[in-house]
Design a protein with these regions (language model features):
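Catalytic machinery of carbohydrate-active enzymes
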Residues: 1-222
Length: 222
């Protein structure tokens, strides 16, 4: 989701350049409102599973006549794709792991570049200059009646919170997150997003404590 304002800013600065986003099918709706953006859905559980599946995916990407790749993940899968897509400009995000480690260990207090800034840096390294200081977003869609029924009227600000991550080291403790939510809900409606069954139970427990907090984990899709 954090890539959306970056891609929007890119398209505004380079309206003649077509972007193709490679992502999982469940995330494809996030990009539906962006100009000059198409989506290729990857299925890493079946068609594109394993090295052979990634090779199959690389052939699909070559057939789109892609001229350059901006890797905004820099994980094992994309490193393998980089190998299969040799000959095509392929620039990867610098996640700043050393800078982050230095910050949390107290070795430095230098502010870190945000993830969205790092996303933009990848495109700049490919020769596309643009700024993200004033991001724009796609126009909001009409909410489904099931959503308005679940959450009620949106008379004040709404804050979405997704406290969980794929790795425990990237997850803020649920007790501390509860404290954050308790403060946020005093002035804003808070909507909690989750993951699996265990995470959903924890979010529902938090939501039950506050009248202005709602858990939608497992209830809606994009």
């Amino acid at each position: 989701a954090m890539t959306v304002p970056v891609l929007s800013a890119f398209s505004n600065a380079h309206p003649k350049v077509t972007l193709t986003v490679l992502t999982k099918k469940k995330f494809a709706p996030l990009f539906r409102g962006l100009k000059m953006v198409t989506v290729i859905s990857a299925d890493f559980n079946t068609t594109h599973k394993g090295v052979l599946g990634l090779y199959r995916l690389s052939k699909l990407l070559r057939n789109t006549q892609v001229e350059a790749v901006a890797d905004l993940h820099n994980v094992l899968r994309t490193k393998i794709l980089k190998f299969f897509l040799s000959g095509i400009k392929f620039h990867q995000i610098d996640k700043g792991r050393f800078e982050k480690k230095a910050l949390i260990t107290g070795k430095t207090k230098t502010p870190l570049r945000t993830t969205t800034q790092r996303y933009a840096d990848v495109f700049r390294s490919l020769g596309f200059e643009f700024e993200i200081d004033s991001p724009s977003f796609p126009a909001p869609k009409q909410l489904d009646t099931a959503i308005t029924k679940e959450l009620g009227a949106f008379s004040n600000s709404v804050i979405g919170v997704a406290p969980f991550a794929a790795y425990a080291s990237k997850t803020y403790s649920i007790s501390k997150m509860d404290q954050v939510i308790s403060k946020l809900q005093k002035e804003s409606k808070v909507v909690l997003f989750g993951g699996g069954a265990n995470e959903t139970k924890q979010l529902e427990a938090i939501a039950s404590k506050y009248s202005n907090v709602f858990c939608v984990a497992g209830k809606f899709s994009l």
